[in-house]
A protein has these predicted regions:
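Positively charged n-region of N-terminal signal peptides that target proteins for export
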Residues: 1-8
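Non-catalytic, conformational "gating/processing" segments within enzyme and secreted inhibitor domains
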Residues: 53, 92-277, 288-377
Length: 413
């Protein structure tokens, strides 16, 4: 290939608008979809800027969902700051977003159930009484919270009840010498082995909030293995390597202008794999404008895994105003626990694999909480303002939409 694949997972696995309809609908996102996507675009842009010359895979959905577990236990400024950094104007908007996630999962599971029913009906036509086994499909968004029994603080019953009802989250407790293995085992099972471990040591944490996303789906039209083979791939530095390339000639949703080429490869269960060559700044609007076109498609097989830590994930949130949650003296998670906690670390691991049959991908995001300063015992943090040198002053109105300067002056001697 003579051009670099610009989006090796901004290649995004996109929740297509077909996911909520049995029929073929427009691929154009609605106003609400565009608003939701603005968080994804912003987050992906931040990650891309730090990994511009590396293959990577990341899950905005997993990151956002894990943060929802924190929001449910946060209060006051901590809660408001997290909501804003997550791109939500209100708690209601957050709830609506997660309802859309669940609708996408429910649609996928409905498709799987229909395929299983069809297979059962067709089994009678086979001599063995069993139809050929279909590829396994799964789309899971799972949540869990973990309390270190040997540290101070426990989850409040109201918090445990709320996250169970709203996000299906399971709450568990483990001793300091067991919590690491317990959390890693949960991640391994939730991701079918793609993410076998999220942490090497959680023994010192007070709690962990964990989300896992797992997807395994087949292409609507599978690639022929007979057409696959090695081809040149020119990387971002201009170096050429041989990559195992899948090939197809078919009709796909396709967009092209002088800077960009975009193709949408449909996956079963109401999902699409969007690949972009060139400038991907407007990939979502370009996808909305794509039309069915005959395409000679080459796509390299993927097996990419990534790990992101606090430098990227906590850094992203703090740059967008969510600072109190990470401050031991300011964090307010009083709706979560009976002791003062703060978020000490955020981790995400993700992996994606593709072949001629389909795609398998997983991500785990974990928020690690540590013991903070008790809010009721907190000493005020005074900022010094000593007018002991020349200064200016202004007397303004605060009852008007725009302040009026009634008096102004200075003292210099």
């Amino acid at each position: 290939m003579k051009r670099f694949l610009a989006a090796i997972l901004m290649l995004a696995i996109l929740f297509s608008t077909q996911a909520l309809s049995e029929g073929m609908t427009s691929n154009a996102p609605g106003e609400e979809g565009m608003a939701v996507a603005s968080f994804d675009q912003d987050f992906l842009g931040y990650i891309h800027a730090q990994n511009e010359k590396e293959n990577y895979v990341v899950s905005p959905l997993s990151f956002r969902t894990a943060l929802m577990l924190a929001v449910e236990g946060a209060d006051a400024a901590t809660r408001a700051q997290l909501l804003g950094a997550m791109g939500f104007a209100s708690e209601e908007e957050m709830t609506q977003w997660y309802a859309t996630v669940r609708e996408s999962v429910d649609f996928f599971e409905g498709w799987v159930a229909r395929q299983e029913q069809i297979a059962e009906e067709e089994a009678q036509y086979y001599p063995s009484g069993e139809a050929p086994e279909a590829p396994a499909h799964a789309f899971r968004v799972l949540n869990s919270v973990w309390n270190n029994a040997d540290r101070f603080g426990e989850f409040l019953p109201d918090y445990v009840r709320a996250i169970a009802e709203r996000y299906g989250a399971a709450a568990d407790s483990a001793a300091a010498d067991q919590i690491t293995d317990a959390v890693n085992r949960w991640c391994d099972e939730a991701t079918a082995g793609l993410i076998p471990k999220i942490s090497d040591d959680l023994s010192e944490c007070a709690a962990a909030l964990v989300n896992a996303v797992y997807l395994k789906s087949s292409w609507v039209d599978e690639f022929s293995k007979n057409m696959s083979g090695p081809e040149d791939f020119t990387d971002i530095d201009g170096n050429t390597t041989r990559r195992d390339m899948m090939k197809a000639r078919d009709r796909y949703l396709y967009y092209e202008d002088k800077d960009t080429r975009l193709v949408s490869i449909p996956l079963n269960g109401g999902l699409s794999f969007i690949a972009v060559l060139g400038d991907d700044a407007n990939w979502l609007s370009n996808y909305a404008a794509a039309e069915y076109t005959d395409v000679d498609l080459w796509l390299p097989k993927l097996d990419t895994e990534s790990a992101f830590g606090s430098a990227a994930l906590k850094g992203y949130l703090m740059d967008r105003g969510a600072v109190d949650a990470f401050d031991a003296n300011a964090a307010d998670f009083s709706r979560m626990a009976d002791q003062a906690w703060y978020i000490s670390d955020i981790l995400q691991k993700a992996r994606i694999k593709t072949d001629e049959e389909g795609l398998e991908a997983a991500a785990v995001t974990m928020l690690v909480l540590a013991e903070g300063a008790a809010l009721e015992m907190e000493e005020p943090q005074y900022r010094e303002f000593h007018a002991d040198r020349p200064f200016r002053y202004y007397i303004i109105t605060t009852s008007t939409p725009t302040p009026l300067v009634v008096f102004a002056g200075q003292e210099v001697k």
